[in-house]
Amino acid sequence: MDFLHLGSFVFSSRLILGTGKFSNADLMIEAIKASGAQLVTVALRRFNREQIADDLFGPLSALQGITLMPNTSGASTAREAIHAAHIARELSGSPFIKVEIHPNPQHLMPDALETWEASRILAKEGFLVMPYIPADPVLAKRLEEVGCASVMPLGSAIGSGQGLANAGMIELIIRESGIPVIVDAGLRAPSEAAAAMEMGCGAVLVNSAVAVAGNPPEMANAFAEAVRAGRRAFKAELMPKSSFALSTSPLTTFLGKKS
């Protein structure tokens, strides 16, 4: 079997699902089940025991075979992200933390310096750190060196649906990385998830593309199939590209005539 290894955890599914933007919790749960995802990310602010209508921890923790990965979305500094991570671990019991630090709400680009600092400290504290980062090969390597379990470069801006706009940089990150590379943000279509897996990504994280689809459970299942197909294609090894045509048939003879 071909498993995804993150720290001491082993997953058979390489599709990670986000939990934001769903119209209701029941639809979210249905989509998670349809996706076959085993790792699900949820914002700390959705851990709300007092306001049941806003709480996602209860419904998610009731699912069998699901590991929660809290995220620090909303943090604008390393200090805020570290504080959020401590609360999230206490509430969820999960060692995973997705470090998200994007101080500008206009573009939601991750702050590389603050992300590195928070990730360094949290990794020392024993968290399985999964940092959301710009598609920067140098930063990705630095995060690997401080003990992150994976790196999560953005395909394109959060919620933009622009797909793998950073494909070239992501390929460089994959080439140099000794930990799983997980494309996070910007994916719109299952074909883009397949393309990310064909490049050699360890997994993809999808949220908006499923949550705002016309039929979220069906779209979740489509992404699951695409991720599996892309991974199989990567393992089978794609044919090399060529700048000129290469005939699939011998050109030495045609109808008994030698060329």
From Swiss-Prot:
Recorded GO cellular component terms are: cytoplasm
What compartments host this protein? Answer: Cytoplasm
Looking up InterPro entries in the UniProt record yields:
Aldolase_TIM, Thiazole_synthase_ThiG, ThiG
Organism of origin is Chlorobium phaeobacteroides (strain DSM 266 / SMG 266 / 2430)
Q: Where is the catalytic site? A: K98 (schiff-base intermediate with dxp)
Q: Name one GO biological process term.
A: thiamine diphosphate biosynthetic process
Q: Please name the SUPFAM superfamilies in this protein's record.
A: ThiG-like
Provide an example Pfam family for this protein: ThiG
EC number(s) in its UniProt entry?
A: 2.8.1.10
Its main subcellular localisation, reduced to a broad class, is cytoplasm
Catalytic activities? [ThiS sulfur-carrier protein]-C-terminal-Gly-aminoethanethioate + 2-iminoacetate + 1-deoxy-D-xylulose 5-phosphate = [ThiS sulfur-carrier protein]-C-terminal Gly-Gly + 2-[(2R,5Z)-2-carboxy-4-methylthiazol-5(2H)-ylidene]ethyl phosphate + 2 H2O + H(+)
Residues binding 1-deoxy-D-xylulose 5-phosphate are G159, A185, G186, N207, S208
| Assembly with partners or alone | Homotetramer. Forms heterodimers with either ThiH or ThiS.
Q: What is this protein called?
A: Thiazole synthase
* Uppermost EC category: transferase
HAMAP family membership: ThiG
Which UniProt keywords are given for this protein, alphabetically ordered?
Cytoplasm, Schiff base, Thiamine biosynthesis, Transferase
Give me the gene this protein comes from. Answer: thiG
